[in-house]
A protein has these predicted regions:
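Short aromatic/hydrophobic "clamp" motif used to bind/position activated sugar donors
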Residues: 85
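A conserved acidic beta->alpha catalytic loop
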Residues: 27, 43-51, 92
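Glycine-rich, basic loop-to-helix element that forms the pyrophosphate-binding segment
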Residues: 64-80
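Conserved donor NDP-sugar-binding/catalytic core segment of glycosyltransferases
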Residues: 96-126
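Acidic donor-binding loop at a coil-to-helix junction in glycosyltransferase catalytic cores
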Residues: 173-179
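N-proximal low-complexity "stem/linker" segments adjacent to membrane-targeting elements
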Residues: 1-27
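Acidic donor-binding/catalytic loop of UDP-sugar-dependent glycosyltransferases
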Residues: 49, 88-105, 181
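Short, acidic, metal-binding catalytic loop of nucleotide-sugar glycosyltransferases
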Residues: 26-36
């Protein structure tokens, strides 16, 4: 039986995320979209109820073998049927119109990848200001060729994604920057303030603002200067 293609595949990596993934998938399920889309969870062999919750929300579940979020994204993309792949994380809550607004950016046939807006879930003033700065970085730096990507809200045209090899499942961190750098060589970048996801602050608060900022700044610089990104990124539950 032939696979039925869809317009968009929404791909969510997960590992032991039963506390969070329900809210994420519920928000995705509520999306109003002019086309057709599927939801895929790339699961890292979760030991809790993550897989059951995912299936209860109608997601297709595939297990990844690398023990990384990138592995989950890659495994999901391997079975995806969409023309556009949208990637988020299991602890996010996508906003209204998210799928449609991302899809609309790809109506320009020259666009091969895109990034949307991020906002903190239950954030304080410092976290909201930080998110504004990150959104400005994404909107301004990428068109200049200096790739900045937040893997919580990134999308790619399927044909370009596979032409560049897609996510590297072996990368523990900076897999989103790696993908963006590969896609940048193939076509145009787009950014939408309307395509918003609310992101968890659990890692920011666990690590502290300074440690979080210095870690990701260091990884960003490593990616752009040809050095290996960090291999350490412990789960925060």
């Amino acid at each position: 039986m032939a696979k039925k293609n869809v317009d968009v595949s929404v791909i969510v990596p997960a590992y032991n995320e039963e506390k969070y993934i329900g809210a994420c998938l519920a928000a995705i399920k509520r999306q109003k979209f002019s086309g057709t889309f599927e939801v895929i969870v790339g699961d890292g062999n979760s030991k809790d109820g993550t897989q059951k919750i995912s299936r209860d929300y109608g997601a297709r579940v595939v297990e990844e073998k690398f023990g990384t979020a990138s592995g989950g994204r890659y495994a999901g993309s391997k079975i995806a049927r969409g023309k556009i792949y949208i990637f988020t994380s299991s602890d996010t809550v996508p906003g209204e119109g998210w799928v449609q607004n991302i899809y609309d950016m790809f109506q320009d046939k020259n666009v091969v990848w895109a990034v949307g807006n991020v906002r903190p879930l239950e954030g304080n003033i410092v976290e909201h200001v930080g998110a504004v700065v990150l959104n400005i970085c994404a909107a301004v730096l990428n068109p200049l060729g200096l790739v900045y990507v937040n893997g919580d809200n990134v999308a790619a045209r399927a044909s370009a994604y596979w032409k560049c090899g897609g996510f590297n499942p072996r990368l523990k961190t900076a897999e989103d920057t790696d993908l963006g750098m590969k896609l940048m060589k193939l076509g145009r970048f787009a950014f939408s303030r309307k395509a918003t996801v609310m992101i968890s602050m659990r890692r920011v608060r666990k690590w502290g603002y300074w440690n979080f900022m210095t870690f990701h700044t260091g990884n960003f610089l490593a990616a752009h200067f040809g050095r290996a990104p960090s291999k350490m990124y412990e789960p925060i539950r």
